[in-house]
Structures are given as structure tokens and as C-alpha cells.
Amino acid sequence: MGFATRTALRLIFSKKKKTFINFLSFISIIALSIGTAAMIVVLSVYNGLENTLKSIYKDFDPEIKVEKFESKYFEDTYKEVISGIENISEVSSIIENKVVLQNEEKEVVAYLKGVDNNFTKQNRISKNLTEGRFIFNFDNLDYGVIGRGIKYSLGIRTNSDFQSIKVFSLNEGKKLTPSMTQQKMYNEDFLKTAGVFAIESGFDNNYIFTSLGFAQTLFDKKNYISSYEIMVEDKENIEKTKEKIKGTLGSDFLVLTDVEQRAGLYKILQTEKLVVYFVFFIVLFLSAINIFFLLIMM
């Protein structure tokens, strides 16, 4: 008879069997309690992270965004039609594209976002200003509102009378050839800095806001936009509103809610939560099975 078998038989028939089983039961219950508490804490952290991300993106992303399939720009002729749909409070015309920003010898690549007056009324960016004001025109001069990261990268001084940002945009309307001069390859203009916003580094390092007219002229896209950004009156009915917009505009347009605009990120969070559920389920299941068999042995 092996050592393991003799030890097992002694435990089974020993007077100390009950005490030993009680000890194992206590350990199993402790493990089960710790596992349950850990699962609650971890899931609470994930839920808190998700809510935090939603609150951050809420200031930057619209509740509904409309873009055109297979086309970067489209004519700004649908605004009134969309505005007439039930549950819509604001419709903003937006044009956005990559640009190069230059201040003296410093340069950064960023997204220039041209917005109309309706966007300004929504107060989404202006409430996150750390310096200056959210204005785009003053004394016949064009202004931009930049992210804090761009300010540091370019060494910008807000509201300086002597400092302007030089903005370059690739001339997409012309075919590039080796003989083209830089002047023909790029459209360029100047912006003064009206304010600085701080939301999240991904936005702060990459975005500059200005007027719709300035951006359309720079991109050589007069009367064209890249998207509509829409705010709704009742968020509970956002899916119904989205479907109405799709029905009105037709299949040529892509209509996304705020969650769908960040679908990849939220999908990762949900996947991680499911993995956590699965791991803790296995731990709790094994602990529960252990307790069950210990109770049978008592």
C-alpha cells in the first residue's frame, strides 16, 4: 500500500477527520469570498472606465454623425431636411481634413476641423477651454482653437498679436507631378490662436478648430462638407432617430450613433469584461465544487 493511500485512509477514519474537513471548508469559503469580491471590484473598475470614456468622448463626438459612403466630401444641401426630422435639436455642418501646422521652425500634422455656428452653440469644446475664447473671426482676422498638445509642440502663445500659425493643406484637386512647385501642391493660409482646449491627449495633440468658411477655402471645397454632426433632444430615442435619418437620406449615407463611432473601443471593453466573467466563473465554480464535496464527506 502506497504512502498516499495510507495517508488518505488515516484521514478518512481518523477522529480528526471532521476538524480537517472543517479547515478545508473554511479555506474554500475564504477563497470563494475573495474570488467573488475580486470579481465585483474588477467589474466595477471596467464599468467605471467605460463611463469615464463615454463622458470624455461625449464632449468631442456628436450623438449622431452622418457621412457619405465612398466619398470624402459632399454638397451641404441636406441640412434643412435633417433638421425637420423629429427629435433633432441641432445639425452642424463640418469639414475636416489633415493639415500641416507651422510656427517658425516647428511643425506638426493635425486635423483641421471647420465648424459652423450651430456647432459653437453646442458648447461641447468651449466648456473644455483652458485658455482664451472659442471664436473664429475677430477684426477681419481668422482664428483657430487648438488642442493643448499642439500648443506645446508649436510653442504657441495664445492671443499674441505677432504670432500666427501657418496652415498647409494638400491640394487634392490637382494631380501631383514631379514638375509641380510647392506652391501648387499645397494651399496655405494663416490662423491666429483664440483659445486652447484640453479633453484627452488623443484630441489635444491632433485637433484644431476653425470656421467652416476658412476650412472650405483652404481645402478648396466651397459649399462642400465631410459630415453632419447631430444632437438629439431625447437620447432614449436615438436609434429611432438614426433610422429616420437613414430613411430620409438613403443608402448613400452612413449614419452612426455616438457608441457606433467608437465601436472598436467599446467592443474591446466588452470582450475584456467577458474574459473576466469567464475566468472568475471558473474560479468560483471550482471553489463551490470543492465546498460541496467537503460537505458530503462530513
Question: Can you annotate each of these PLM segments?
Answer:
Residues 37, 43-111, 117-140, 247:
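Hydrophobic, regular-secondary-structure patches
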